[in-house]
């Protein structure tokens, strides 16, 4: 009882500010250090993202820094050992880079496509994409294809911005908030802050989700929808709005293509395309001039409804007329979709009308003068205060692209976009629809040795000519992105890389580089088979591995590292420089363009290097033109120098703050040699706050677009007209019908998919996998969610966060469990068409009765992530991934195709259907189980049963 309390010695402490990396929010953090140790982490009250709020993940960043899973040195697979055995020899960084440089030099000088470079949740895609482009390989993407590309693509092909990084609810003025399929890890602190504001003002919060946890637990109303039915629900709401004539006429005719005229010529070329003038402008019918006029002009009076005969004799119809014909069909009436959605018809109609009431009867008006892009002066901004947000619950279905477009259709009808109280854009968005960036598809450039690509590997196709295919229609990318199978795969298909590379379909790789991507475990579908593929050998090629050389870059000992031939150890986020750039996935908020940095707060105690630095060095070694001087010597001394001095175009660099030689310019300006120091002085972030006249209606706000054009966010200063009807989709449909003057698919499967799924108006169809499985045999939907306190496999190694959860359960509806004789903590079998697992069950009321679900990535392979072999994560935790195939179930007469959205290639994680039954007595423990991973050389960490951490005395035991 005489023990003295050890008080803080503030004189020995130092406070530094940086950016969190415990999830994708990128919150600002205040880090207290003592003797090169992290004492504690707090939120930065001045930061635009989190305003001082910090979640469990962010606070537990200390235990990421002191994780026992950290890699310690470069490692090479020992000669004579098999891939996956985990037997390695330490090598020096110089040796490692020499080995990699020699291999990459040979690939680049012969066939650059033989390199695949794919990255996980790295938040530095502007650099990794540039690196791949300079190497000359089309085979690059980040993780978006298995994350939420459906959200991004649907938004960027519809409204010019999107859910996630490119837009946010206006929490300050919203009066009604509808959340679609958002797990509680997503945009964690900003949403928490926003919901508190909404609740304090008495706004209504409605959630659409099969599961009621996290954010949904505090919703005023929960709609427990059946998975994959969200688009049908949205279209039923559209039906209600149109039936009751609840739409914003002025918004539709000024800012959308609702009045544009569409050619009606079924079976003929040009059917479904916009009627255009000789300058390619879309035409409308002007009801005052009684003439066809340019639909982009400002002084027009467009007809919103109507059918006309064009000067060339073709019949044309307004987009709005086509929408009314489709969505007023009784197919979409609430009473006719209620059973499919699992929701009361009354609730569907009521919520649609509630939104309309708030939009049109509780309008927000702000006395702000602004000028539109046509030169008209406005003395106020009018906001329809209905905000929405959507994420993976919509995206992770093979119908998610159209479902998200349907949600945007509601927003457009209500006029509830980029104005007070609704869903607002975040810089550098909005952009032209779609953005004017096309993927590299010139086969001569792709095949050229030692030659950078002329365009980025990723982009936004608008027609079949933009596909990345050869003259015979074969894919030029290893993941088949931008092929006839998935034409608008704007983020690639990382989940298909290992399968395609193993099958040499469409060709073989020589080297695959994976950065921070746990593709041997929770980031892949069909996990056990993927591990087998990584070990697979080509017996026709002297037993060479089918993927000959595999490089893994990670800071931690994940399940993936043991399959590497070469392991390059990365630093933690507190040990390196980073830029969170406006060229990439910035931290902007609706009222400010913002970016941020990280810089080393503590010195690594291991032989590790930041992958950013390694990429810059490799770029110099390989003599990439953007990274070398005319004499072939490196242009940049390292990553910091690169970030300061690289310019995508004159004055446009990775960081937007403190540009210009004297640091006085924002967004655009010459390189500033003191730029890093200025960011550090400003607590590691920069924010350019928009003046009031540039905050709203930015798709048509001349004052904003002038600045955006100068900053490189957009090209010309012209209106960004929102698209109910997507002409790019119709061009692909025409190609499938054989009616397109340009490339057309020669495979019947591809033709049928284009005709069926490339509808220019949002459509709903049953998820693809569910079309091919017996629903009576597999009666349950099965999902995963990310918990609020963990972010994928990053954090279930974290000793503080593990105390919250070290075992995931399969959750099911309590009433359904009683019917089946299942009770809490029973062991059950769960089986899909692809495989089966054994796991432990818990029951809950807040789950749609036909749905079972679990937390994502809690389950671990024994020996991974610095955990003991008997850790609960390995013995009781489990993955749902084993049940999910990366390919659709076989269909007679059809090649196997990806289990993804047919438009975007989004991985269809949530299309899964399963059956369940109680395990027999004695059947306990999670299944399947895998051999334990071996400790890696240099892993001398203790794994205590009880942890005490105190930076003041360096206690950790």
Indicate residue ranges for each PLM-predicted region.
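Long, contiguous, secondary-structure-rich segments that constitute the structural scaffold
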Residues: 600-601, 611-670, 795-811, 815-957
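Glycine/threonine-rich phosphate-binding loop and adjacent beta-strand/alpha-helix elements that clamp
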Residues: 574-604, 614, 889-892
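Extended redox/cofactor-interaction regions of prokaryotic respiratory oxidoreductases
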Residues: 128-207, 232, 408-563, 572, ...
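Local cysteine-cluster metal-coordination motifs and their immediate loop/turn environment
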Residues: 17-29, 51-61
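Active-site phosphate/pyrophosphate-binding segments
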Residues: 319-324, 330, 335-490
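Short, Gly/Pro- and small/polar-rich lid/capping loops
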Residues: 1-25
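Long, well-ordered, tryptophan-enriched scaffold segments
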Residues: 216-217, 221-375, 381
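Glycine-rich phosphate/diphosphate-binding loops that line cofactor/substrate pockets in enzymes
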Residues: 96-115, 167-175, 326-329, 349-387, ...
